């Protein structure tokens, strides 16, 4: 028998990025309404932080995990026999994924750029190193741009890099390539 902690760990790379800050804010509000508290886990500063947080789940410190980080191999998640919810990455057939309609997002982005007469586009895309629903957005965007004859330069961002220095490097690298 194990007494529930009433705590859900929310794993994100960093709350310095507005997307993750807003996501955590909304997750916390919804979980609070259901009688849970969150333990916020920023993982970008420590190499093995994600694994340590999953270990907390196994040791009954938290009742479940909502994860938006994906530095671990999918096999690590498959070992966990407690509630896990992922967003924007498939972690296994028994782990639910929350994702947006990425194909529609790609279509909308392409339509807006085309409507505004854009002819040469730099397309920053997520890493293809992992299977993720966000690839659908990029494929749809690229498909539409190609059909419309718009020149599109794809720039693949490194996997799991969220710091400002990396983005400065990426922009410099992009201009060196163009």
Predicted regions span which residues?
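Short, glycine/serine-rich, charged loops/turns that create anion-binding
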Residues: 4, 15-16, 45, 72, ...
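Short acidic/polar active-site loop segments enriched in Thr and Asp
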Residues: 6, 63, 118-121
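Residues that line or immediately flank small-molecule/substrate-binding pockets and catalytic motifs
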Residues: 12, 69, 125
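Bacterial carbohydrate/catabolite-sensing allosteric modules
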Residues: 29-34, 58, 79-86, 91-178
């Amino acid at each position: 028998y194990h007494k529930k902690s009433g705590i859900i760990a929310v794993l994100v790379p960093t709350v310095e990025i507005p997307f993750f800050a807003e996501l955590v804010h909304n997750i916390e509000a919804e979980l609070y309404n259901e009688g849970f508290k969150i333990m916020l886990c920023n993982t970008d500063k420590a190499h093995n932080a994600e694994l340590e947080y999953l270990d907390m789940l196994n040791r009954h410190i938290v009742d479940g995990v909502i994860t938006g980080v994906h530095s671990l191999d999918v096999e690590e998640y498959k070992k966990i026999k407690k509630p896990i919810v992922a967003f924007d990455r498939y972690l296994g057939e028994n782990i639910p994924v929350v994702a947006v309609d990425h194909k529609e997002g790609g279509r909308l982005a392409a339509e807006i750029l085309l409507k505004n007469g854009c002819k040469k586009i730099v397309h920053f895309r997520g890493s293809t190193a992992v299977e993720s629903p966000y690839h659908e957005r990029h494929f749809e965007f690229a498909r539409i741009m190609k059909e419309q004859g718009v020149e599109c330069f794809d720039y693949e961002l490194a996997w799991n890099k969220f710091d400002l220095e990396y983005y400065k490097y990426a922009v410099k690298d992009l201009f060196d390539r163009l």
